[in-house]
Structures are given as structure tokens and as C-alpha cells.
Design a protein with these regions (language model features):
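Helix-rich interaction surfaces within compact, conserved domain-sized segments
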Residues: 72-121
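Short coil-to-beta-strand transition motifs
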Residues: 36-46
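A short, Trp-centered hydrophobic/proline-enriched beta-strand micro-motif
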Residues: 23-32
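Acidic, aromatic-enriched beta-alpha/helix-loop junctions
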Residues: 44-92
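N-terminal leader/targeting segments and the immediate start of mature chains
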Residues: 2-23
Length: 121
């Protein structure tokens, strides 16, 4: 796995492009803080997107049922695996680290059609 630091000047473009490639992914958000320890904010929820708002100086991680805001982000690191981005780590102005882990949503098998041929007779 390779890790890359993303320069702040590229955050908006990087997250816009990343969000387009994350359709169908699920995310887990962990907040690591010296004061509070490690807390899981969200567990494998459908990911809508990640965006950087330069005007308000925040990163928004939008999940199906949660909007997670990171105020005053200072550093962004991305972990790349074989299939692309597997995690994003963001350090905020208070020294907390927010880790977004990504995975593909589970694919369910197609419904069985065993009984459908009998009902059409």
C-alpha cells in the first residue's frame, strides 16, 4: 500500500475527482484524539462524497445518514491499494486525526427465478 500527502492547493479538485470514483463505496469514519482516544463515528455507511470548502476551511464527508465535518483541516494523506483509494487520513487544527476507510458495498446474488417458469404456464 502506498501513501501520498495531498497539497492543500489540490484538495478541492482531488476530493471532487475522488468522489466521482467512490460511487457504490461504503465508509467507516474513525476519530483519533489524544483527549478522547479512538472513536468510531460511522460504521460502513454508504458514501455520498467528500468535499473541501475553501471558504469555510472545512472538509465534509457525506454519508447516507451522516454529514461529518472536519474544521480547519491541516493535512490530508491518502492510502492507495490495488483497487485505488482505501483510506483518507485528515489532521485537523486541534491535532485530531480523522480516518476514513473505504470498501466496496457487498454485492447480493441475483434473485432466484426457479419458480417463474411454472407460473407462466
Amino acid at each position: 500500500m502506498a501513501t501520498e500527502q495531498i497539497d492543500q492547493a489540490r484538495w478541492a479538485t482531488f476530493f471532487d475527482n475522488l468522489s466521482k470514483s467512490l460511487i457504490g463505496k461504503q465508509a467507516e469514519i474513525e476519530v483519533a484524539s489524544l483527549g478522547l482516544g479512538d472513536q468510531i463515528e460511522a460504521q460502513w455507511a454508504p458514501l455520498i462524497g467528500i468535499a473541501y470548502d475553501k471558504k469555510d476551511d472545512l472538509i465534509e464527508i457525506a454519508l447516507n445518514d451522516l454529514d461529518h465535518l472536519i474544521l480547519s483541516p491541516r493535512e490530508v494523506f491518502v492510502d492507495f491499494g490495488i483497487g485505488g483509494v482505501v483510506a483518507v487520513a485528515i489532521a485537523d487544527g486541534d491535532g485530531n486525526r480523522q480516518i476514513v476507510r473505504l470498501k466496496d458495498a457487498l454485492s447480493l446474488p441475483a434473485p432466484s427465478v426457479a419458480g417463474s417458469s411454472e407460473s407462466s404456464r
